[in-house]
């Protein structure tokens, strides 16, 4: 597995990052909570100008890598747009399917459903894609862009397994970007905040927390890269992507918990970016399934198909 990204993809990520910073970075997400129309007024035109929504994550290596890194850049500012949902749709279906949601069981609301025309929802338990009809906005403190939904008939022509794998992969890169920003905020605070005449990062408790969150982030980045490599080779199975999801959730819990501890009360203030990042991550961390339910799905997948890793596990049913 190559551990470095194609240079063209890295250059594209830099352009995407500059564009999102010009929109205000995390402030755009904060503003969009107060006025949902800012998603279409500001985020969508920027994405179209970059040509990002038209890229194909199943395309050639440079294009696919550019998608992953651009989604990571979007996550770094918790961009208020369903980018992973849109890009998880194969290029040949985008005229008929506007986005992909992942669900587990019955749902009554989904994030950004009001923006996605002719979206589908894939049930992880049944492996079936169904049409989504969006209703009125139903925001909640930890689900700021939710809308009510009704799931309809099965969507013909959608390869549920394929779009599920890509959506999980894109989610992981989006979360990686958000966690990288959270980690940077914590590290900067530990370096700059003075206590008893020295930076708080010199104290053992803070150093341990910074080490823990850095290790969790590095582990997620490495696993996301490996999962992308497996998908590119056509070797990824459901257990691989579910393992990535479980790692994503656990890494987020570690980075956010330790980040808040490093920041103290400041990190809980509404005006601080860490609070916004934490809040905007909750929908992807809990939908379609949280840590316990995702681990259960992973266990069932391993039982059915085995798992190739450092210590391979054979299927047993």
Task: Locate the predicted segments by residue.
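Glycine-rich phosphate/cofactor-binding loops in nucleotide/flavin-utilizing enzymes
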Residues: 1-2, 266-317
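Amphipathic, small/basic residue-rich leader segments at the start of a protein or domain
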Residues: 1-77, 302-317
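Glycine-rich cofactor-pocket loops
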Residues: 2-3, 28-37, 184-214, 225-240, ...
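Hydrophobic packing residues in well-ordered alpha-helices of helical domains and bundles
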Residues: 9, 172, 203, 210-213, ...
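Long, well-ordered alpha-helical segments
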Residues: 12, 16-22, 126-127, 145-158, ...
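FAD-binding core of flavoproteins
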Residues: 76-184, 188, 308-317
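Alpha-helical transition-metal enzyme core signature, strongest for iron centers
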Residues: 176-183, 210-213, 217-220, 224, ...
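Charged, glycine-rich active-site and insertion segments that engage polyanionic ligands
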Residues: 236-267
